[in-house]
From Swiss-Prot:
Residues 11-162 form a coiled coil. This is SWI5-dependent HO expression protein 3. It is a peripheral membrane protein. It comes from Scheffersomyces stipitis (strain ATCC 58785 / CBS 6054 / NBRC 10063 / NRRL Y-11545) (Yeast). RNA-binding protein that binds specific mRNAs including the ASH1 mRNA, coding for a repressor of the HO endonuclease. Part of the mRNA localization machinery that restricts accumulation of certain proteins to the bud and in the daughter cell. Required for the delivery of cortical endoplasmic reticulum into the emerging bud.
């Protein structure tokens, strides 16, 4: 029992100490709760103050932004005002300078006005003197004009009489012109006949030349065929013929290439088509074109002659009209060149010289008149165009009238001199060089 009592005493002490600690803790807890409530109230108050401070800070920030924007506007306004001030100051300086310049200019204008006034007075005096001299000159020239008018009337009367005399002389000269035109027309006909005969002769010569060239080509072709066959047979008989030629003759010959070229030449060479000299389509086309060109030339020459005759009737001065044949505008007959290709063409016309009414043909060289047939080597230089002779009727009389019936008759005869009936006859004999082509392609 004593042991139990002894053991219970420390436990009661522990319990008492624990109760006392619990009581302390309770009191401490109550104090902590009270302080917690106080702190909680303070926290609420502080949070409310913090919110109010945040709102005040936002308002202050907004006010600061507004103040900054206002400050920037003020600064920009100040900068603009400074620029305006600088501009106004510069414009003020320029205006002051302009004012000074205007003052100087005004002084100069006043001086020039004074000098202009003095010049005006001087010019006025000179003008009055000029007016007086003009009146004197007008009176003098009026007198001269009256004298010239009387002389002009006398000159008109004299020229009228002279014009009548020249008209009578012109009517007598028209007969001589008609006679000369008739003689020139007859000589022109004879010249056209000579051209026709010459072209026929050339046509025959070219025909015989084409036939001879064809015969010569056929002979050459047959000879080439025989030589090709002979070389082929020799190669078949002696396969080493090329080496033997090289050893004995010291010449390297490619017989296969030679035979192939010969066969190609024989296959490409043809003499079946003949060139016609009269009935070729090129010749008929060229003849129709030449006729159309002749008709066009006749119309142009007729209109030019009508105008020239009108002008000639106004410019006759001498007693007799002179007929001059310009040698530069006459036909050009040059020498015939030797042909070198398969295409043939007509030779040029012989040179023709004329001295007033005397005409002559230059003699041909023996080489031109030769009829020996040679292979073609060069094209003939062709000049099929025959320019009509320009007959210049130099009338030296200067009258404005004349016998218009005689002028019309002379005009028709001059047209007949340039007419196309003789040109068409001669142009029909012109040979188209395209009709003389011989196909000899190698």
């Amino acid at each position: 029992m004593e042991d139990n009592t002894a053991s219970n005493k420390p436990t009661s002490r522990v319990i008492d100490s624990l109760h006392s600690q619990i009581d302390d803790l309770k009191t401490e807890l109550e104090t902590v709760k009270i302080s917690h409530d106080d702190y909680k109230k303070k926290y609420v108050l502080v949070s409310q103050k913090n919110d109010s401070f945040v709102d005040q800070l936002a308002n202050a920030k907004h006010e600061n932004d507004m103040i900054n924007a206002l400050l920037k506007r003020k600064e920009r306004r100040i900068a603009d005002l400074e620029d305006q001030y600088n501009e106004l100051s510069s414009s003020n300086e320029s205006l002051q300078l302009n004012n000074k310049n205007m003052k100087i200019r005004c002084e100069n204008l006043q001086q020039s006005s004074a000098s202009s006034t003095a010049e005006y007075e001087r010019l006025k005096i000179a003008y009055d003197a000029l007016i007086a001299s003009q009146v004197e000159y007008k009176r003098h020239y009026q007198k001269e004009l009256n004298t010239l008018a009387s002389k002009l009337e006398a000159y008109k009367t004299e020229n009228k009489q002279r014009f009548q005399d020249l008209s009578s002389k012109l009517s007598s000269n028209d007969k001589d012109i008609d006679t000369l035109l008739d003689s020139m027309t007859n000589k022109r006909k004879a010249l056209d006949n000579l051209y026709v005969n010459k072209n026929k002769t050339i046509l025959e010569l070219l025909t015989s030349l084409a036939k001879a060239a064809k015969i010569h080509g056929l002979d050459t072709k047959s000879t080439l065929e025989e030589n090709t066959v002979a070389i082929s047979s020799l190669l078949e008989k002696y396969p080493d013929l090329q080496e033997k030629i090289l050893t004995h003759e010291k010449v390297e010959v490619d017989l296969d290439e030679l035979i192939s070229e010969s066969n190609e030449t024989l296959s490409n060479c043809s003499f079946e088509s003949e060139a016609t000299l009269v009935n070729s389509p090129e010749l008929s086309d060229s003849a129709s074109q030449s006729k159309n060109a002749d008709h066009l030339k006749q119309d142009v020459k007729a209109s030019s002659l009508s105008r020239s005759n009108t002008l000639q009737a106004k410019k006759r001065k001498n007693k007799r009209n002179s007929v001059r044949i310009d040698s530069k505008s006459g036909p050009d007959f040059s020498s015939i060149t030797t042909p070198t290709t398969g295409q043939f063409a007509l030779p040029k016309k012989p040179t023709f010289t004329s001295n007033n009414d005397n005409r002559g043909f230059s003699s041909r060289s023996p080489s031109d008149s030769s009829r020996n047939i040679t292979p073609p080597h060069q094209d003939y230089e062709i000049n099929p165009k025959f320019q009509n002779q320009n007959v210049h009727l130099n009338n030296d009389t200067n009258n404005k009238g004349g016998n218009y019936n005689n002028n019309n008759n002379n005009r028709s005869k001059r047209k007949s001199l340039y007419g196309g009936q003789y040109n068409s006859k001669r142009n029909s004999q012109i040979i188209d060089p395209n009709a003389l082509n011989i196909s000899m392609t190698t």
